[in-house]
């Protein structure tokens, strides 16, 4: 376990908090009005923490409807670049025209990095709408931090993550006062003890001897049982060879075990895996469906559309994203769904 202790009793940046949620009281109309008023009245950069993908979309639509289109040359050129290389109807394209970016865990990393760079430039992006991805390996800050939503995905925002987010307000030697606008009630202040256990889902890829100090007795027993099962199914020599060759690209022990059993018991049905290397993508269907069924309910789309997506995406070495999207349109997969499935 790790425990954090305060050793220094001062802040390099003062955080000026505005608890607007006390007046908003959960009213979505008042919250939207408050956000627009903040953006209209403040100077400097604004980081808008939306918390979830659906609320990024909600905030984005609000800004597209209410912020004017900018004539700044760099913004105009960036929006044109997004139109050519992605989609002219995309939410991000329309936001970029209004000096606003998006940061989440689904966008291409290079695209996120470009937006952070534009946000940090003096006179390009004024705002960025984000999920908690903005505090995950991203070193950026803003004079204004607006907490639109007190969630982190499906979970309530915890005190540790909340402080990380509002800690992006202000920057030493640049703007010493960070303005924090709370549109929803923040989590209660709580002492933080960070405990990072190994989740059971990754036990199939862990050396029980190397990490025994971090594993529970039950987890060690599960790893030993898993290895015995795999040796019985595949044979010890074959299993060891696969481990050394890093063949397992999934660390979920339950999934690996069920797949090994399925292939062992129904060998004829799994004949032809080499067809997945075929240039004829129409030969992939049967095996793609079989693989999908091994993890039912995890695909967030009809199986037939996911299979179509895989087949079309395989052409990404020779086709542009707009060309891929044109084909995916037949399966009702737009650019947002594209990033989600990718």
What is the meaning of each model-derived region?
Residues 9, 15, 22-127, 142, ...:
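Conserved C-terminal RecA-like helicase domain
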Residues 1-2, 128-134:
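Ser/Thr-glycine-rich phosphate-binding loops at phosphate-binding pockets of nucleotides
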Residues 144, 151-199:
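Conserved segment of the helicase C-terminal RecA-like domain
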Residues 129, 146-147:
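Short hydrophobic alpha-helical runs that function as membrane-insertion/retention elements
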């Amino acid at each position: 376990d790790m425990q954090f202790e305060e050793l220094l009793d001062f802040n390099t940046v003062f955080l000026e908090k505005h608890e607007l949620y006390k007046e908003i009281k959960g009213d979505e109309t008042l919250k939207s009005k408050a956000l627009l008023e903040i953006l209209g009245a403040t100077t400097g950069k604004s980081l808008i923490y939306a918390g979830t993908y659906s609320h990024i979309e909600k905030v984005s639509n609000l800004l597209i409807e209410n912020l004017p289109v900018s004539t700044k040359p760099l913004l105009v050129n960036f929006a044109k670049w997004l139109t050519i290389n992605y989609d002219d109807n995309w939410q991000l394209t329309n936001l970029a025209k209004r000096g606003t970016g998006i940061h989440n865990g689904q966008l291409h990393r290079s695209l996120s990095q470009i937006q952070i760079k534009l946000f940090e430039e003096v006179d390009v992006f004024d705002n960025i709408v984000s999920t908690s991805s903005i505090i995950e390996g991203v070193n950026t800050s803003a004079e204004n931090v607006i907490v639109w939503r007190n969630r982190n995905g499906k979970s309530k925002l915890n005190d540790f993550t909340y402080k990380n987010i509002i800690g992006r307000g202000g920057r030493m030697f640049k703007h010493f006062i960070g303005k924090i606008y709370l549109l929803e009630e923040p989590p209660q202040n709580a002492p933080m003890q960070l405990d990072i256990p190994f989740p059971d889902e990754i036990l199939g890829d862990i050396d029980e001897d190397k990490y025994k100090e971090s594993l529970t007795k039950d987890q060690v027993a599960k790893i030993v049982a898993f290895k015995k099962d795999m040796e019985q199914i595949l044979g010890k020599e074959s299993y060891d060879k696969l481990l050394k060759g890093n063949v397992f690209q999934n660390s979920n022990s339950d999934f690996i075990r069920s797949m090994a059993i399925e292939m062992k018991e129904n060998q004829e049905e799994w004949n032809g895996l080499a067809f997945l290397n075929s240039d004829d993508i129409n030969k992939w269907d049967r095996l793609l469906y079989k693989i999908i069924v091994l993890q039912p309910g995890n695909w967030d789309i009809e199986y037939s559309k996911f299979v179509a997506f895989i087949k079309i995406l395989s052409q990404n070495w020779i086709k542009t994203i707009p060309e891929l999207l044109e084909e995916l349109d037949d399966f009702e997969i737009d650019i947002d769904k594209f990033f989600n499935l990718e």
